[in-house]
Amino acid sequence: MHNICNRSNFAPRIKLKRKMKKQTIATQTNYQKPDAYGALSMPVYHCCAFEFDTAKHMTDSFTGRVPDPEYVRVMNPTVTFFEKRVKSLTDAANVFAFNSGMAAIANVLLCFVKAGKNIVTSNHLFGNTVSLMHNTLGPLGVETREVNLLDLGAVSRAVDDDTACVFLEIITNPQMEVADLSALARIAHARNVPLIADTTLIPFTQFDASALGVDAQVVSSTKYISAGATSLGGLIIDYGTFPQINRKTRFELLFNMGCYMTPHAAYMQTTGLESLDARYREQSSTALELARRLQGVPQIKRVNYTGLPDNPFYELSQRQFGNTAGAMLTIDLEDKASAISLINRLKVIHRASNLFDNKSLALHPASTIFAAFSGSQRRAMDVYDTTIRLSIGLEHVDDLYEDILNSIHS
């Protein structure tokens, strides 16, 4: 990086003899002072271009010989700081930050697909990801093969020599199905196919995706990381097993697609990382207690939360995600009218489409994030009119429970 002043030239911080815990790493830079003046937060570099010392210096930057920023569409010190902070919390070889989760998904798929190739994925997938695969990549000659990922035999039959990647969500939204990552990785890797996982619903700090066979994670950092829904963002966490992710992203797609994270978003999300662990533990604990209480409400026909011991995915979820199940759950009422009525009467829980805000949120998936699909398509995806999705925030569980009860009984 260019020297701003000679204040220790970003002197390294003192490191502990043992590896620090993730909660500490999330608040420490671990590699240098972030600012020439000793600021405790990385400054926001709101500029489009960066000056070079010589013409050769400029050439070396543009050809990748030195890691200095040349243009904010592909590199910015504030964003690089955020990427390095995320990398320090994982075993990743590379981390790339984008301006949304969907941009991260599109980028990682474009690292592998081309005409004649196919993507093997779940028949339970986020609506915009489905649209990306069918409506954007489909006309370019890329086939999408949707299978039940719980049926490992079906997955094995779907993967062939033309498969570009296996793509999944670790917990489907809103079906709450949990993918067996290790089993799916074995199937994919037998054909030298990468396993790409959208891990938005469980923070990457809570489990070791690489140890389970995941080759790259995509994350909507808009969710848990942004801390209060303050900024859009997405991440690719690349474990280096398929070099084309780094090569194509760094030297092609960032230049050509214009999907790089903004400096302000990187600043906000670096700050969000510092409190991620504490917020997640509180939100997931509240989600579990609320789910337990709602099981006793007669008007609620089903509570779907993988942290409940009677959930069919409980053991797999606990094994993969370190005895945690996240802050999203769904409830089913008698019919659509009852579900809509409950949502309309909520006073504490907000009607909004985001996930993992500091505030709790309620959504009717069938009429919102899956509204573009026909009734028969939604039923095939197990998205039902009776379902309400709840994203649990930092409110007290007593207030959330009372809000739902009052909405049912009023």
Which residues make up each language-model segment?
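Short conserved active-site loop signatures built around small residues
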Residues: 20-45, 236
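Conserved PLP-enzyme active-site core in the AAT-like
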Residues: 26-33, 94-299, 304
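Short Gly/aromatic-enriched secondary-structure transition segments
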Residues: 59-65, 346, 404-407
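Conserved C-terminal alpha-helix-loop-beta "cap" of PLP-dependent enzymes
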Residues: 302-388, 392
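Glycine-rich beta-alpha junction loops
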Residues: 31-33, 46-52, 223, 275, ...
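PLP-dependent enzyme catalytic core of the Aspartate aminotransferase-like
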Residues: 7-10, 15-19, 134, 140-143, ...
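Conserved N-terminal alpha-helix of the aminotransferase class I/II PLP-enzyme fold
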Residues: 49, 54-103, 128, 132-135
